[in-house]
């Protein structure tokens, strides 16, 4: 079993975008920003234990950081990892519900 401390470090934040919102409505998929060293099993366990839902599948992608200019200097944003977590039928997780 994964330690509680590690579970809290795996999930960083929900990723809110137009694509993420459409996925949530159509295919019951939630998108999270996760730690770069997190694997699919850790992500699934973290979502199941923290939000008390059943996970069907997890897909991950590493988003490469963009090169940006700061005046005359060139800089680069950090790489980050995104996880698409598909919940089982009948399960739901709504972050926006309490904000209204």
Curated annotation (Swiss-Prot):
Cellular component terms per the entry's GO annotation: ribonucleoprotein complex; ribosome
One Gene Ontology term of the molecular function aspect: rRNA binding
Cross-referenced InterPro entries: Nucleotide-bd_a/b_plait_sf, Ribosomal_uL23-like, Ribosomal_uL23/eL15/eS24_sf, Ribosomal_uL23_CS
Keywords: Ribonucleoprotein, Ribosomal protein, RNA-binding, rRNA-binding
Pfam families: Ribosomal_L23 (PF00276)
GO terms under biological process: translation
Subunit details: Part of the 50S ribosomal subunit. Contacts protein L29, and trigger factor when it is bound to the ribosome.
Function (record text): One of the early assembly proteins it binds 23S rRNA. One of the proteins that surrounds the polypeptide exit tunnel on the outside of the ribosome. Forms the main docking site for trigger factor binding to the ribosome.
Similarity comment: family membership: Belongs to the universal ribosomal protein uL23 family.
Record-given protein name: Large ribosomal subunit protein uL23
């Amino acid at each position: 079993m994964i330690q509680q401390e590690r579970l809290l470090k795996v999930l960083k934040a929900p990723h809110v975008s137009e694509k993420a919102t459409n996925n949530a409505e159509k295919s019951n998929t939630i998108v999270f920003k996760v730690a770069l060293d997190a694997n699919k099993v850790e992500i699934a366990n973290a979502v199941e234990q923290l939000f008390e839902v059943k996970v069907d599948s997890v897909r991950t992608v590493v988003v490469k950081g963009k090169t940006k200019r700061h005046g005359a200097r060139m800089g680069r944003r950090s790489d980050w990892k995104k996880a698409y977590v598909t919940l089982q039928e009948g399960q739901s997780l709504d972050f926006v519900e309490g904000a209204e």
